[in-house]
């Protein structure tokens, strides 16, 4: 019974997270340091997000800023995160954010 309850909770959480996924464009911002961080307009500060490109590269980054404030963009990532996503040459890439 306990295992069934845990499995049901995990499935429910997965469904909730999938329902809250955003799809759109990501850009990146320069500057020093920051590690794997990002800026999002509404997600609470400190939240860990998974950002996945449509090419299949994926990272986890912590929300530590607000933005982007450019139409069509849903997230700004740090230079380190942009390198990991393979987007430093293009500057903007289509992503899903969970």
Question: What is the predicted role of each segment?
Answer:
Residues 2-98:
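Secreted/periplasmic proteins
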């Amino acid at each position: 019974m306990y295992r069934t309850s845990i499995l049901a909770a995990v499935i429910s959480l997965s469904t909730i997270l999938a329902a809250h996924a955003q799809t759109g464009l990501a850009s990146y911002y320069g500057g020093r340091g920051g590690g794997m961080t990002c800026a999002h307009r509404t997600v609470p500060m400190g939240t860990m997000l998974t950002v996945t490109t449509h090419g299949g590269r994926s990272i986890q980054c912590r929300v530590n800023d607000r933005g982007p404030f450019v139409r069509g963009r849903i997230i700004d990532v740090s230079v380190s995160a942009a390198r990991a996503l393979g987007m430093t040459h293009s500057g903007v890439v289509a992503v899903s954010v969970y």
